[in-house]
A protein has these predicted regions:
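Generic long, charged, amphipathic alpha-helical segments
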Residues: 269-270
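Structured secondary-structure scaffolds
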Residues: 1-263, 282-325, 329-330
């Protein structure tokens, strides 16, 4: 055991499985992956490989709590009972009293009169918790008029190719024949400025409240916006100071613009055709930056937006355009 360091004895016991080959579950899931947009693109191959090489899904667990596997098994034949009326009755019971109704209501209340409750075992196993989380699309999206299914985007850490993305795909494909998402975005994890996992024992944790107190919320927002979430995100005093400097440059650029436009009236507006070449060039660059930012937003490429806007403000506006035109203002 990883917790007690004591040796474990493994024993095989009968379990419930979801077959990856029956009804072409694996093949359909792989086809759905091909239709999905991944951010970053490398996530597609990772999820594809995991689905392609996974064994059948062991669905059952033996625990004292959880979502039950509502199945009756014939004690003589070992076959599960396949009766739509019984299944519908179980569904109705769950809607009224929750899934615990399976453990609280006797088998005779679910079975048709033609069945002898003594001939059937009411399974007490619970479902794998990943099956629970993989089903969230059903009650989050399908039961709400203001949302659509499938989801535009599933967003989680890169470890969820093996977890939530994985189970959601298999559950949805198995029950609905399609993936529950159109896109998947994965991000890295927050580390210290040396690339180490944060730990109290190492004393390298960073409390967001400390950043808010010492630097303000905008600095923390800029750190988020400027970090490449495709990789693990580093944070520390020097990194925060770096973003503080960027913030100061952006703020000074905006202050200069607002100060220069103080008292501007609409009737002072100049037609584009009458503008000097330098202003025409600048408006052209503004349009280029605008189009580039919109394109990057569509691709969730936020850290590139941060870099582009910062460079435009500090290099093209502040260092170039302002320097040329300041004599006209003063």
């Amino acid at each position: 055991s990883w917790r007690s360091k004591a040796p474990l004895v493994f024993r095989n016991t009968p379990q419930w499985f979801i077959s990856m080959t029956t009804n072409n579950l694996k093949e359909t899931a792989l086809n759905e992956i091909e239709k999905t947009q991944f951010y970053p693109e490398a996530g597609k191959q990772r999820l594809y490989y995991m689905i392609e090489n996974r064994p059948d899904w062991c669905l059952s667990r033996q625990r004292a709590w959880g979502i039950p596997i509502p199945v009756f098994v014939n004690k003589k034949t070992g076959e599960p009972l396949r009766d739509k009326i019984v299944i519908d009755r179980i569904v109705s019971s769950f809607k009224k009293g929750g899934s615990d109704a399976w453990f609280e209501i006797p088998a005779s209340n679910y079975l048709e009169p033609e069945y002898d409750a003594n001939d059937f075992e009411q399974i007490q196993d619970i479902a794998d918790v990943w099956f629970d989380s993989g089903s969230t699309h059903a009650f989050v999206l399908e039961d709400r008029d203001d949302l659509k299914s499938p989801a535009n985007l599933y967003l989680e850490g890169s470890d969820q190719h093996r977890g939530w993305f994985h189970s959601s795909l298999l559950e949805s494909v198995g029950s609905r024949g399609v993936a529950p998402f159109e896109g998947i975005l994965t991000h890295g994890f927050v580390l210290d400025d040396k690339g180490r996992k944060m730990s109290k024992s190492l004393g390298n944790t960073v409390n967001p409240q400390d950043i808010l107190r010492d630097y303000g919320a905008d600095i923390l927002r800029l750190w988020v916006a400027g970090s490449d979430y495709y990789e693990d995100l580093r944070i520390g005093p020097e990194i925060i100071k770096h973003h503080t400097d960027h913030y100061r440059r952006l703020r000074n650029t905006l202050r200069y613009l607002l100060g220069s436009l103080n008292g501007f009236q609409e009737n002072e507006k100049i037609d584009y055709s009458d503008m000097p070449q330098l202003e025409k060039w600048l408006l052209h660059r503004v349009n280029e930056v605008n189009n580039s930012v919109r394109e990057k937003i569509e691709g969730y490429n936020f850290h590139s937006i941060y870099t582009e806007i910062h460079n435009f403000c500090t290099i093209e506006l502040s260092s170039f355009y302002f320097e040329i035109r300041k004599d006209l203002l003063y």
